[in-house]
């Protein structure tokens, strides 16, 4: 389906895109006139453009024009050398001739070689009425459609702008959070050094405790030895006491005699 655009958009597209070919399309009206429109084909475009031209009388056969079947009761179309030329839109550039080469010569397709330079336009299957054309044009994009698209683009642009501001604010927040993380990292590093120093102190204290335990163990062994000696001395004292008691008894016996 060709895409319908405005004359202004067509002129802009003609300046920015390379035009490849065009053909004239006619639609039969009830008053015997044809509605002529030029269908342009552009390079690197996935659609064609129909540019409306003013109403023209019935057109006979020509290189780029095909004559359709006559409607019953309609006037006969002239068929002869005196063919009226197609009316041209003043804003529409003439694309029937290609760009001139160096030296002022035209591309092939001039009067010396009429069989070259133009692509043959296929004959339309049938002519359509105004109503049928309007039904088909409903599928084409209109100025209102372009306006809606422009509005959507404006909304998307504003949305992207707002999102860009939000991303900028979030970037500042992330940057501030990064600084906080760096400060926390330094604090954790200092605390780690302190914990490491405390660990060294605890390790030294543990070594001291081990040495004290060893000394306590040695003192315990000495205490045990002293207890054994005290026990032995106690037994010796008991023997001495018993000996003294026996000696006292003997003395008493001797005195009584």
Swiss-Prot record:
InterPro entries: DUF16
Biased composition (Basic and acidic residues): 80-104, 115-132
Region (Disordered): 49-132
Signal peptide boundaries: none
Domain of life: Bacteria
Coiled-coil intervals: none
UniProt similarity note: Belongs to the UPF0134 family.
Protein name: UPF0134 protein MPN_013
Taxonomic source organism: Mycoplasma pneumoniae (strain ATCC 29342 / M129 / Subtype 1) (Mycoplasmoides pneumoniae)
């Amino acid at each position: 389906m060709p895409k319908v655009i405005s004359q202004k958009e067509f002129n802009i597209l003609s300046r920015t895109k390379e035009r490849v070919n065009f053909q004239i399309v006619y639609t039969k009206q009830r008053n015997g006139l044809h509605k002529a429109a030029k269908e342009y084909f552009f390079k690197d475009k996935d659609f064609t453009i129909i540019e409306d031209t003013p109403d023209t009388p019935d057109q006979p056969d020509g290189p780029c024009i095909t004559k359709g079947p006559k409607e019953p009761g309609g006037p006969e179309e002239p068929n002869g050398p005196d063919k009226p030329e197609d009316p041209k839109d003043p804003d529409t550039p003439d694309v029937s001739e290609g760009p001139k080469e160096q030296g002022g010569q035209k591309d092939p397709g001039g009067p010396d070689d009429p069989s070259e330079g133009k692509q043959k336009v296929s004959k339309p299957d049938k002519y359509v009425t105004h109503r049928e054309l309007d039904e088909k044009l409903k599928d084409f994009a209109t100025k209102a459609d372009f306006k809606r698209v422009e509005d959507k683009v404006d909304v998307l642009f504003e949305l992207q702008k707002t999102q860009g501001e939000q991303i900028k604010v979030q970037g500042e927040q992330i940057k501030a959070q990064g600084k906080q993380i760096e400060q926390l990292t330094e604090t954790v590093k200092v605390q780690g050094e302190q914990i490491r120093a405390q660990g060294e102190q605890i390790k030294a204290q543990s070594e001291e405790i081990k040495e004290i335990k060893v000394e306590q163990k040695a003192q315990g062994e000495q205490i045990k030895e002293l207890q054994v000696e005290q026990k032995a001395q106690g037994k010796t004292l008991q023997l001495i006491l018993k000996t003294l008691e026996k000696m006292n008894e003997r003395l008493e016996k001797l005195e009584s005699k």
